[in-house]
Amino acid sequence: MRIDVLTLFPEMFSIFNHSIIGRAIGKEILKINTVNIRDYTIDKHKKVDDYPYGGGAGMVMAAQPIVDSIKTVKKENKGKVIFLGPKGKTFNQNLAKELAKEEELIFLCGHYEGIDERAYEYIDMEISLGDFVLTGGEMACIPIVDSICRLVDGVLKSSESYEDESFYNGLLEYPQYTRPPIYEGKAVPDVLLSGHHENIKKWRKAKSLMITKKVRPDLLKKYRLTEEDKKILKDFNKKL
């Protein structure tokens, strides 16, 4: 997968040189480029923003450097142009799965009070990280790109690494334990030490259901429960 990020702060994306994403870049499974929007402004002072027409607080990113940077990147990257903004569709795991199927993507990070409306003509999709305010699109872009990239084939060692994670299958993840078997008087559940894979699988599914029911009941409304799932939840409710 190739991703180009249009931003005023390319240095912020150096985080992708590390850990899982960094290794995938090293293996050429991923290619993540940053493009400095400021390099495309025709303003002699390298300005990329200006005061909004009609008045108001803050500054607005000008259309010209945004559009010119998109046009240049589009010569090599034919992917969708995704703007990180508050009016967009809220990002979730299902959208991450959908975008992970793409071979190329372009992300546009806004800043200041937003972007000139005329730049939207070159944008295919707008995504929001949530109902809160961030300093700039970079803050939203980093976790979104990370979430997408880890689903690309070959980035993780196996699909099992993400298929059991919270949200992937619609449930929160089960509790995890590692050595030592007893810490501060608290022991690892016996089932996890039993070596009985089927029982471990059932225990993990039960715990996922119980945790989701307790912490995020809204997720269960969207989840297709089996008869066994319903029995687990019924038993769990009796214990409350």
Swiss-Prot record:
Similarity remark: Belongs to the RNA methyltransferase TrmD family.
EC number: 2.1.1.228
GO MF terms, alphabetically ordered: tRNA (guanine(37)-N1)-methyltransferase activity
Function of the molecule: Specifically methylates guanosine-37 in various tRNAs.
Cell location: Cytoplasm
Oligomer status and interactors: Homodimer.
Reactions performed catalytically: guanosine(37) in tRNA + S-adenosyl-L-methionine = N(1)-methylguanosine(37) in tRNA + S-adenosyl-L-homocysteine + H(+)
Primary subcellular site in the record, as a coarse category: cytoplasm
Superkingdom of the source species: Bacteria
Entry-linked SUPFAM superfamilies: alpha/beta knot
Entry-linked InterPro entries: Alpha/beta_knot_MTases, tRNA_m1G_MeTrfase_C_sf, tRNA_m1G_MeTrfase_TrmD, tRNA_m1G_MTases_N, tRNA_MeTrfase_TRMD/TRM10
GO cellular component: cytosol
Gene Ontology biological process terms, A to Z: tRNA N1-guanine methylation
NCBIfam families from the UniProt entry: PRK00026.1, trmD
Gene3D superfamilies with a match to the protein in the record: 3.40.1280.10, tRNA(m1g37)methyltransferase, domain 2 (1.10.1270.20)
Name of the protein: tRNA (guanine-N(1)-)-methyltransferase
